[in-house]
Curated annotation (Swiss-Prot):
Its main location: cytoplasm. This is Protein GrpE. It comes from Ureaplasma parvum serovar 3 (strain ATCC 700970). GO terms for molecular function: adenyl-nucleotide exchange factor activity; protein homodimerization activity; protein-folding chaperone binding. Participates actively in the response to hyperosmotic and heat shock by preventing the aggregation of stress-denatured proteins, in association with DnaK and GrpE. It is the nucleotide exchange factor for DnaK and may function as a thermosensor. Unfolded proteins bind initially to DnaJ; upon interaction with the DnaJ-bound protein, DnaK hydrolyzes its bound ATP, resulting in the formation of a stable complex. GrpE releases ADP from DnaK; ATP binding to DnaK triggers the release of the substrate protein, thus completing the reaction cycle. Keywords: Chaperone, Cytoplasm, Stress response. It is found in: Cytoplasm. Residues 1-32 are annotated as: Disordered. Gene3D superfamilies: Head domain of nucleotide exchange factor GrpE. The gene is grpE.
């Protein structure tokens, strides 16, 4: 009887052990599934983070490229504006210089026109004398010595930007640079053509300060 009890007890122990083993196995499987699920969740989360990180990097690169492009555009605009400003400044400076030069030239022109007429008349008269031909050899030789002096005076005027107006016989009358002293009849020359030059004229910077004086055919 005692042996039977022992067998029964042994069987019960085995049964309990089996149940414990099954329970432990079940718990282990459950725990393993939970870990697996957690691992997969972490993997998924990491992958999502990687995707987000990639997107952020791409977005950051795009922003950097946009900023770089904006900087380049801004620099180009600044350079363009700077060039335009420089051109405007140079234009204004040139305009001011031109105005100043025009005022100076106008002032000099008035001085030459109204203050130098006696000197220009004297130069004309002196030049006419030394350029004439004389029958007396002594007078002609004496006059030759003054021709260089006469030319030096003309060169001096040229240095002041004063140039001679020298009409020629048979030239058509140009009332912009010539002044009629006399209208001559019966000259056999075309009407309003020069028959004699009384005196040369003078210009300063292409503006007449003294008209050439001429006789013309009627």
């Amino acid at each position: 009887m005692s042996k039977n009890n022992e067998n029964i007890k042994h069987q019960n122990n085995d049964k309990v052990n089996n149940q414990v083993d099954k329970k432990e196995t079940k718990n282990h499987n459950k725990q393993e599934f939970k870990y697996k699920e957690l691992y997969e969740h972490e993997l998924k989360k990491n992958k999502e983070l990687q995707n987000i990180n990639t997107l952020l990097k791409d977005k950051n690169q795009q922003l950097e490229e946009q900023i770089s492009q904006l900087n380049q555009d801004f620099i180009k605009q600044l350079e363009t504006k700077a060039k335009q400003a420089q051109q405007i400044l140079e234009q204004k400076v040139n305009e001011l210089e031109a105005r100043h030069e025009a005022k100076v030239n106008d002032a000099v022109f008035k001085i030459f026109k109204f203050k130098m007429e006696p000197l220009l008349d004297a130069i004309n008269h002196f030049t006419k004398i030394v350029n004439q031909n004389y029958d007396d050899p002594k007078i002609q030789a004496f006059i030759e010595g003054f021709k260089m002096f006469s030319q030096n005076m003309i060169d001096g005027l040229d240095n002041l930007k004063i140039t001679k107006i020298s009409p020629q016989v048979n030239d058509s009358l140009n009332d912009e640079i010539m002044e009629v002293f006399e209208v001559v009849e019966n000259t056999n020359k075309p009407s309003m053509h020069v028959v004699e030059v009384i005196s040369d004229g003078f210009k300063y910077n292409d503006k007449v300060i003294k008209f050439a004086v001429v006789k013309v055919a009627k």
